[in-house]
Amino acid sequence: TLGPIYLSKMNVENESSEFTQHKIPRNDGTNYADYLLSNVEVRCIAVDAGNRKWMGTTNNGVYVISNDCNTEVKHFTTENSPLPSNLIKDIIIMPNGLVYFATDQGLCSYMSDVTATNEEMTKDNVYAYPNPVKPDYTGSINIVGLSFHADIKIVSVNGTLVNQGKSTGGSYSWDGCDLKGRKVASGIYMVETATEEGEKGTVCKIAIIR
């Protein structure tokens, strides 16, 4: 059966030749599961700072799989991306989140939303972009320079919580909406950070113009 397989750390240390195919639960009330990327020939794998797996295939483009290997985050092909070919020979991920794909028809790059992590979060390395956020901007607001699994809280100047979550790698993406999914009003918003262990990090500001 085609598809990715893995060798556990314990089996490596014991010089075992036992490989495992990862199963994804169907979550349909049954105990059934399906193999990850079953019958897909994987040629190369790269892992980003968020522990997501970028899998290049022989004729199916690139799959991005979540850190727990249970969710397909993205699937790039020649039909929905600038990939010149669906035959992927190699994938390289840079610390700034830029991903290079080597295909049999040439190179292609993609700016992902995950950057390398920082051990310490300081005012010198934690920042948001674009900043200010102008009225015609419709994309995500990215906070970078974070530690692994950092806790993020975005609050208004009067202390109202508008968004919270955890970083993926050294980055966090915010859609500019509050907890109810509404676009926030013009103003200054504070990004409060803390480490996975609960230690306070730094604060950066985002200016939004509607």
Can you say where each PLM-predicted feature lies in the sequence?
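Residue-level structural signal for beta-strand termini and adjacent loop
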Residues: D68, S167-T168, Y189
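C-terminal tail/sorting-segment detector
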Residues: M190-R210
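Glycine-centered tight-turn motifs at strand-turn-strand junctions
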Residues: L161-V184, T195-E199
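Glycine-centered coil/turn sites that cap beta-strands in beta-rich domains
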Residues: E120-K153, S171-W174
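Carboxylate-rich, polar loop motifs that coordinate divalent cations or form catalytic acidic clusters
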Residues: T1-V126, D151, L161, E192
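Short, glycine-anchored, charge-dense loop/turn motifs used at functional sites
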Residues: D151-V162, G181, Y189
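Short, acidic, Ser/Thr-enriched surface-loop or helix-capping motifs
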Residues: D48, M94, S156, D178-L179, ...
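Residue-level signal for WD-repeat beta-propeller blades
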Residues: V47, G56, I93, F101-A102, ...
